[in-house]
């Protein structure tokens, strides 16, 4: 399907609002669009459409806006479960997050949970909006809440002392009732987001990686592997490694084609066929990757943050225990893995999110923040992300 070309001279950043239920995430999202985008009312954002990511249904609202410096895509979720699913599946990638915390309540259970999730799924930076400051008349109390939020962030390895904390009222901004804590605070918040949340490196500037989807042998020319380039650029004549499942091997890309035309290079986002030198048709398989030599290693053991589907979502009807052996679907292939639950966790119920240890039966090209689906016989029963690699 032809889409209109996305032309923009400003850097693009994906962000989202996180925080406890009813602390004002959606009101803040609405307030930002009021000054920086095409205004979206609370109800328009709150009625988030459902979408599917990795076989999981998630309600997510997307808005866009821009500051003089950047263009933003912003995601807001109606329910806590949607946040968990969103962050784990990466349905809406976050380059940074705005943590919304009510000054009247201080940090609450989901404040903590969203910060932990942000840490586990590798959200690089957080900016804090202390909302509802008009409900707190004591300046000392306000300082205490700010301190509490900073300490909470530090306890999850975010730089709590350096993170910008902006105090204001999303409602005051929406109702134009108090400019200082309304409009001024929203403008101050976006200035902080502009300066504190780093611009992500564009996929095309990262080291080359292409998951292999298919392998063909073309008589007289050799072996062709096809797939969509995940990141970076591959030029004809460059050396690459084939990583995962089998021992890592090196080869040279002797041709790149797209839509049956020969190119001198393929780049992030392109669906290409790459002709590789000196590799037999059976020397390479789906589920391996082509990558820049030395950039990615194969691993079997990792810690993961996972969300397990409920029965209603098409998931399991029963809990699972340590030594559970489902398939882990990484990029283009399923690999069986053995799950070990954390100490003190007897079982995992459908609908839970959990940190687990996994050992795959064969090594897979893997990095932190790589996403996967958990499947049983081809049916998705969960989603996860590699939180850290063990070996």
From Swiss-Prot:
Binding site for GTP: 19-26, 76-80, 131-134
Region entry G4, spans: 131-134
Aminoacyl-tRNA synthetase as UniProt keyword: no
CDD domains, per the entry: EF_Tu (cd01884), EFTU_II (cd03697), EFTU_III (cd03707)
Pfam families: GTP_EFTU (PF00009), GTP_EFTU_D2 (PF03144), GTP_EFTU_D3 (PF03143)
Start and end residues of each stretch annotated as G5: 169-171
Main location: cytoplasm
Database matches in InterPro entries: EF-Tu_GTP-bd, EF-Tu_GTPase, EFTu-like_2, EFTU_2, G_TR_CS, P-loop_NTPase, Small_GTP-bd, T_Tr_GTP-bd_dom
Binding site for Mg(2+): 26
A GO CC term attached to the entry: cytosol
Residue numbers spanned by region G1: 19-26
Keyword annotations from UniProtKB, A to Z: Cytoplasm, Elongation factor, GTP-binding, Hydrolase, Magnesium, Metal-binding, Nucleotide-binding, Protein biosynthesis
Reactions mediated catalytically: GTP + H2O = GDP + phosphate + H(+)
The tr-type G domain, residue ranges: 10-201
Ranges for region G2: 55-59
GO terms, molecular function: GTP binding; GTPase activity; guanosine tetraphosphate binding; translation elongation factor activity
Family listed: Belongs to the TRAFAC class translation factor GTPase superfamily. Classic translation factor GTPase family. EF-Tu/EF-1A subfamily.
Role of this protein: GTP hydrolase that promotes the GTP-dependent binding of aminoacyl-tRNA to the A-site of ribosomes during protein biosynthesis.
UniProt-listed PANTHER family: ELONGATION FACTOR TU, MITOCHONDRIAL, ELONGATION FACTOR TU-RELATED
Complexes and interactors: Monomer.
Record-given protein name: Elongation factor Tu 1
UniProt organism field: Rhizobium etli (strain ATCC 51251 / DSM 11541 / JCM 21823 / NBRC 15573 / CFN 42)
């Amino acid at each position: 399907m032809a889409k209109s070309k996305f032309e923009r001279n400003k850097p693009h950043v994906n962000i989202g609002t996180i925080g406890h239920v009813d602390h004002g995430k959606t009101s803040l999202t609405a307030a930002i669009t009021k000054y920086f985008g095409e205004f979206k009312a609370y109800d328009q954002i709150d009625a988030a459409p459902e979408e599917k990511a990795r076989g999981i249904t998630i309600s997510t609202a997307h808005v866009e806006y821009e500051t003089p410096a950047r263009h933003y895509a912003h995601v807001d979720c109606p329910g806590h479960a949607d946040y968990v699913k969103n962050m784990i599946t990466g349905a809406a990638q976050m380059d940074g997050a705005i943590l919304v915390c009510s000054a009247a309540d201080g940090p609450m259970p989901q404040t903590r949970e969203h910060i932990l999730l942000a840490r586990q799924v590798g959200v690089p930076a957080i900016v804090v909006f202390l909302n509802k400051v008009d409900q707190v008349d004591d300046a000392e109390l306000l300082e205490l809440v700010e301190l509490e939020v900073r300490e909470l962030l530090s306890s999850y390895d975010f730089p709590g002392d350096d993170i910008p904390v902006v105090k204001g009222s999303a409602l005051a901004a929406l109702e134009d009732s108090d400019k200082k804590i309304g409009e001024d605070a929203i403008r101050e918040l976006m200035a902080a987001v502009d300066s504190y949340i780093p611009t992500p490196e564009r996929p095309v500037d990262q080291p080359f990686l292409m998951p292999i989807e298919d392998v063909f042998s073309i008589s007289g020319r050799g072996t062709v592997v096809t797939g969509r380039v995940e990141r970076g650029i591959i030029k004809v004549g460059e050396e690459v490694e084939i990583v995962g499942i089998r021992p890592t091997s090196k080869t040279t890309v002797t041709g790149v084609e797209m839509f049956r035309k020969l190119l001198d290079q393929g780049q992030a986002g392109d669906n290409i066929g790459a002709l590789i030198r000196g590799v037999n048709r059976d020397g390479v398989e789906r589920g391996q990757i082509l990558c820049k030599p030395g950039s990615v290693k194969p691993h079997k053991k990792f810690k993961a943050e996972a969300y397990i589907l409920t029965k209603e979502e098409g998931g399991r009807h029963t809990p699972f225990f340590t030594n559970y052996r489902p398939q882990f679907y990484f990029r283009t292939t399923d690999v069986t893995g053995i799950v070990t639950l954390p100490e003190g966790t007897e079982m995992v119920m459908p609908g839970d999110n959990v940190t687990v240890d996994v050992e795959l039966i064969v090594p897979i090209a893997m990095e932190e923040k790589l996403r996967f689906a958990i499947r049983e016989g081809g049916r998705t029963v969960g989603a996860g992300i590699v939180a850290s690699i063990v070996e």
